[in-house]
């Protein structure tokens, strides 16, 4: 809806005006939504700063004046098609939603995936959208970052010129209680017969400290050691030595409130046995302890490179503007960007081992197994659903 036009900008003109001024699509002009924030961004020559500010201010202040049922219905179908394409009709496409549902209780903001269910998308009314926009897309709930080749006093004057007249929105309602126990209490098991899957795959998710927790850097480094790159423990064991998987990796989501998810994934070879793959993955995770200084140093160096490399760009994901916005959004500190590397440097082997012993345990995990439909009969009879 944010690109469908506002009072002074027609449908599609946001992109066309920025592209005519030197911006490009993709990482230069886009919008994203994840569990904890929605962000919109553009990157273009510095002499076009006022154009970008005018466009953003116009849709923040006047989007509802151009919104109607036809636009809502159109965008509803766009999102439904995105769900079909990226989730429902993709091999293993439902893995995130299934692990979220297992690792976070019903009623928690992280219990559901970001894109929403088909039922929720169908039920969203024009009034729902208008009320949501009035509540959350207002100056008192927004972070505006201008970065790059700018004159700071002049940039601030332009911001005041275009945004000062937009009134505050209503008080943003506080989040429901997001606190959860450190441990989910028992192993959750889910087996999915997947008609799209070419091979079995096993996903093991753990509830871990959130990105706001002081242990968050240790979570990232633990995930790196176990599951990032060909030097990781999982790749070395499952792909290189045992040769039971074609890929093995880990993902840390960086969720902000209450808890986070650390997920390890192994994909088998076509025709291979899902039980053997699961057994091998769980065995490696059970041995996630006694990390070495070399492993810690390697993971820390990789994170340092990725972080510093991202800061070489002004826009895009992980660029300077993005990091400044993250700092204020999650920590109320735009200077947080200058603290990240120090936080990684302070993680010790004891921190990693303690975190693994506390969180990478059977009673704190959800095991999700995807079985290709043609292999299902031999397995489904013994499946225990949560």
Model-inferred region functions:
Residues 4-9, 61-70, 290-291:
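Short, polar/flexible loop-turn hinges at active-site or ligand-entry regions and domain interfaces
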Residues 49-51, 152-156, 214, 271-276:
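Short, conserved charged micro-motifs
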Residues 325-329, 336:
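C-terminal, helix-dominated tail/subdomain
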Residues 54-59, 157-163, 277-284:
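Short amphipathic alpha-helices in soluble, non-transmembrane regions
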Residues 9-48, 73, 86-141, 165-213, ...:
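Non-catalytic beta-strand/loop surface segments
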């Amino acid at each position: 809806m944010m690109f469908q036009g506002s009072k002074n900008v027609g449908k599609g003109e946001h992109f066309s005006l920025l592209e005519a001024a030197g911006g490009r699509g993709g990482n230069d002009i886009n919008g994203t939504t994840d569990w904890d924030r929605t962000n919109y961004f553009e990157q273009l020559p510095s002499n076009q700063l006022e154009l970008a500010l005018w466009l953003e201010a116009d849709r923040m202040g006047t989007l509802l004046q151009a919104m109607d049922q036809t636009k809502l219905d159109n965008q509803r179908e766009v999102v439904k098609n995105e769900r079909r394409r990226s989730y429902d009709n993709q091999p293993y496409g439902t893995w995130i939603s299934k692990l979220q549902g297992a690792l976070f209780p019903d009623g928690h903001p992280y219990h559901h995936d970001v894109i929403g269910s088909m039922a929720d998308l169908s039920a969203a009314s024009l009034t729902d959208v208008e009320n949501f926009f009035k509540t959350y897309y207002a100056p008192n709930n927004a972070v505006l970052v201008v970065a790059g080749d700018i004159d700071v006093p002049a940039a601030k004057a332009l911001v005041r010129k275009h945004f000062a007249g937009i009134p505050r929105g209503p008080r943003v309602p506080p989040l429901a209680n997001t606190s959860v126990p450190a441990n989910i209490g028992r192993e959750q098991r889910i087996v999915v017969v997947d008609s799209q899957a070419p091979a079995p795959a096993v996903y093991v998710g753990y509830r871990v400290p959130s990105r706001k927790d002081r242990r968050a850097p240790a979570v990232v480094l633990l995930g790196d050691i176990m599951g990032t790159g060909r030097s990781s423990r999982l790749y070395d064991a499952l792909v290189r030595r045992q040769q039971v998987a074609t890929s093995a990796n880990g993902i840390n989501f960086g969720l902000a409130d209450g808890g986070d998810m650390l997920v390890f994934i192994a994909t088998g070879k076509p025709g291979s046995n899902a039980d053997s793959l699961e057994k091998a993955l769980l065995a490696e995770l059970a041995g996630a302890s006694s990390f070495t200084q070399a492993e810690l140093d390697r993971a820390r160096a990789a994170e340092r490179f990725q972080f510093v490399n991202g800061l070489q760009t002004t826009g895009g994901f992980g660029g300077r503007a993005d990091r400044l916005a993250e700092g204020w959004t999650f920590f109320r500190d735009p200077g947080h960007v200058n603290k990240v590397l120090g936080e990684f440097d302070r993680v010790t082997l004891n921190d990693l081992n303690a975190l693994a012993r506390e969180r990478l345990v059977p009673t704190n995990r959800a095991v999700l197994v995807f079985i290709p439909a043609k292999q299902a009969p031999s397995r489904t009879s013994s499946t225990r659903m949560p």
